[in-house]
Amino acid sequence: MPSIRLADLAEQLDAELHGDGDIVITGVASMQSATTGHITFMVNPKYREHLGLCQASAVVMTQDDLPFAKSAALVVKNPYLTYARMAQILDTTPQPAQNIAPSAVIDATATLGSNVSVGANAVIESGVQLGDNVVIGAGCFVGKNSKIGAGSRLWANVTIYHDIQIGENCLIQSSTVIGADGFGYANDRGNWVKIPQLGRVIIGDRVEIGACTTIDRGALDDTVIGNGVIIDNQCQIAHNVVIGDNTAVAGGVIMAGSLKIGRYCMIGGASVINGHMEICDKVTVTGMGMVMRPITEPGVYSSGIPLQPNKVWRKTAALVMNIDDMSKRLKAIERKVNQQD
């Protein structure tokens, strides 16, 4: 279990210490579950009333909240960002052994950097290049001529097809598949003819991809994921999609082929986005959005009907179904009124 003096933690976080710097911090916890040795954080002033009951040894907070502190405190401008950084310092995620498992199968032509870890039953095919400090989890497959940059980690059972490029310091969670064939077929009088997918997937640096996500290889050009992109679990990213730097994609999103998404976008969970179009930089699509047309202006976009009691929803649905007829009737009334005038 990691531990650190509160004063040392404050220094690493560039935080202002209030209280005993010799307190030993052994973990991060929520305000409700924290006990002695824990540090917690408060983002919203509405939680001030809970400080009296909080058992944490220290709390991260803003200057405005400091008068309400009942324990040692670290004062910062952005408590949530500080929480992320201190969680990294006190991370308890198991670290892999820096070795090659006896059951791993590694082709003689593969190139491995220093301190590479390859787990049990992993397969590394010919021409693969693994950078320094790369971690390949148990049961992973890395196909021919793929490259994985320094410091990147694949959790167990990740599949990387051939000719894929993954940048430095990337994290890919279990059961994700990178580089499977895109959904490309031509129709010959009712019969589907497969189109070989000859492109690649190019993933930038500092990209994180959740579990059970699929990113298809390009048909001719490449599927490209920019630097700093974060993608949640169970997303489908089709062939030739391009996602700009630092865009965030929440769980269950489906992106059709040849879609281009700009930088600094946020795509809400379970959204569906049409292909062969562009979304500009700094667009937010709220959850379950259905994007059928290009978006050319930054902003927040939504679609669909929010949850309602069933009886209310049925009435709303009926109105929507009849809106065309109502529009025609309204225009007819307007014409009559105009004629009378």
UniProtKB/Swiss-Prot annotation:
GO biological process: lipid A biosynthetic process; response to antibiotic
Pfam families: Hexapep, LpxD
TM helices/strands, residue ranges: none
Annotated metabolic or biological route of this protein: Glycolipid biosynthesis; lipid IV(A) biosynthesis; lipid IV(A) from (3R)-3-hydroxytetradecanoyl-[acyl-carrier-protein] and UDP-N-acetyl-alpha-D-glucosamine: step 3/6
Catalytic residue list: H239
Record flagged with keyword Lipid biosynthesis: yes
GO cellular component: membrane
Enzyme category, top tier: transferase
Reaction(s) this enzyme catalyzes, per UniProt: a UDP-3-O-[(3R)-3-hydroxyacyl]-alpha-D-glucosamine + a (3R)-hydroxyacyl-[ACP] = a UDP-2-N,3-O-bis[(3R)-3-hydroxyacyl]-alpha-D-glucosamine + holo-[ACP] + H(+); UDP-3-O-[(3R)-3-hydroxytetradecanoyl]-alpha-D-glucosamine + (3R)-hydroxytetradecanoyl-[ACP] = UDP-2-N,3-O-bis[(3R)-3-hydroxytetradecanoyl]-alpha-D-glucosamine + holo-[ACP] + H(+)
Function (record text): Catalyzes the N-acylation of UDP-3-O-(hydroxytetradecanoyl)glucosamine using 3-hydroxytetradecanoyl-ACP as the acyl donor. Is involved in the biosynthesis of lipid A, a phosphorylated glycolipid that anchors the lipopolysaccharide to the outer membrane of the cell.
Listed HAMAP family: LpxD
UniProt similarity note: Belongs to the transferase hexapeptide repeat family. LpxD subfamily.
Assembly with partners or alone: Homotrimer.
Protein name: UDP-3-O-(3-hydroxymyristoyl)glucosamine N-acyltransferase
Name of the coding gene: lpxD
